[in-house]
Swiss-Prot record:
Source species of the chain: Arabidopsis thaliana
Enzyme class: hydrolase
GO BP: lipid catabolic process
The keyword Signal appears for this protein: yes
UniProt keyword terms in alphabetical order: Glycoprotein, Hydrolase, Lipid degradation, Lipid metabolism, Secreted, Signal
One Gene Ontology MF term: lipase activity
Signal peptide (UniProt feature, chain positions): 1-35
PROSITE patterns: LIPASE_GDSL_SER
Name this protein carries in UniProt: GDSL esterase/lipase EXL2
One cellular-component annotation, GO: extracellular region
Pfam families: Lipase_GDSL
Residues with attached carbohydrate: N42
Compartments reported by the entry: Secreted
Gene field: EXL2
């Protein structure tokens, strides 16, 4: 039986006291995050360590033949250094690459499972993120990109968040062998940990699988997501991380593929998808605030990317964009991962005019703008 059933079309207009309590917690988080993210005086950020899904995957899925959620082939990477497809779901760099550059750490963050990874890369940070991952375990076990009532194409997920933590444990042991236990602890303590996940849970698992909707309503499913995100952040804290940023989910109802599949004849942003995302983000921010207070550590924070991306989508010309409802690859309506390839899909020549690279992921230019917004707000 479904629990706590709600009308998701009107989630933003709730007037019940529990909702508003959570809402004000979000406001509190937003007004205090600037001070929370900064390092203590005279300390630098030695590394950025990333967990999550395809938004920040840099190639961890490249050699996993059981998943279609990989993109280590052209035209992916067409604007990356040397035009090489690295496994990033983008035409070039992703947001965490730009953030690493702005911190002066390195130009990009490599995938931990990259066979060409150099030992020195471990000292300055890697990404464990994997396309298809989610906070709900079965999101990774069976994630899908294409749905019209019934699944058209099943994409078995890559590396679950629990397994990403196992890889992190392996990473820590390698670090200890390189620089010793004490320096490893210091690097982990001062490094910036970023967790970016949740999009697949909402679009693919909840709204893509009728069986999940029979088991959960939006309220209970987003609570499950937010609780699992809190647990993940707490695990990182137990590993010694002291600068943890957990990013909210973006407005997934406005990505091209979801407009195509659920946006009606005019391909509008899907309101119920965005409402569910906003509800999840509110709960996530509240959970992280609660965790911070429980641990007595104010360096676990919520980072908003919903408004950052939505602002670009709603006012594209301000940022030099012309196309917001289609991706640059192929028709721009549905192509992502396997469907975006040199044999079946052409690529737009004017990529800087597109907000989205494929039907699910932003272009390098969009990521650059979002990284700038991040620095203006949180650093």
């Amino acid at each position: 039986m479904k629990r706590n059933s709600i009308n998701i079309h009107h989630v933003t207009s709730f007037s019940s006291s529990p909702f508003w309590c959570v809402f004000f917690l979000v406001l509190l988080c937003k007004t205090s995050t600037n001070a929370l993210v900064k390092q203590p005086p005279n300390e630098t950020t030695p590394a950025i360590i990333v967990f999550g899904d395809s938004i920040v995957d840099a190639g961890n899925n490249d050699d996993i033949m059981t998943t279609l959620a990989r993109c280590n082939y052209p035209p992916y990477g067409i604007d990356f250094d040397g035009g090489i497809p690295t496994g990033r779901f983008c035409n070039g760099k992703v947001a965490t690459d730009f953030i690493a550059g702005k911190f002066g750490i390195k130009p990009s963050i490599p995938a931990y499972r990259n066979p060409n990874l150099k030992p020195e890369d471990l000292l300055t940070g890697v990404t464990f993120a994997s396309g298809g991952a989610g906070y709900v375990p079965f999101t990774t076990q069976l994630s899908t990109y294409l749905f019209i009532y019934k699944p058209l194409l099943f994409l078995k997920g890559g590396i679950a968040l629990s397994q990403q933590l196992k890889l992190f444990e392996e990473y820590v042991e390698k670090m200890k062998k390189m620089v010793g236990e004490e320096r490893t602890k210091l690097i982990i303590k001062n490094s910036l940990f970023m967790v970016i996940c949740g999009s697949n849970d909402i679009t693919n698992t909840y709204f893509g699988l009728p069986s999940v909707q029979q088991q959960y309503d939006v309220a209970s499913f987003t609570t499950l997501m937010a609780d699992n995100a809190r647990s993940f952040a707490q695990k990182l804290h137990e590993y010694g991380a002291r600068r943890i940023q957990v990013f909210g989910a973006p407005p997934v109802g406005c990505v091209p593929s979801q407009r195509t599949l659920a946006g009606g004849p005019t391909r509008n942003c899907v309101v119920r998808f965005n409402d569910a995302t906003k509800l999840y983000n509110v709960k996530l921010a509240a959970n992280l605030g609660s965790l911070s207070r429980t641990l007595g550590d104010k360096t676990i924070i919520y980072v908003d990317i919903y408004d950052s991306l939505l602002d670009i989508i709603l006012d594209p010309r301000q940022y030099g964009f012309k196309v917001v409802d289609k991706g640059c690859c192929g028709t721009g309506l549905i192509e992502v991962a396997l469907l975006c390839n040199n044999f079946a899909a052409d690529v737009c020549p004017n990529r800087d005019e597109y907000v989205f690279w494929d039907s699910f992921h932003p272009t390098e230019k969009t990521y650059r703008i979002m990284a700038t917004k991040y620095f203006e707000r949180y650093v």
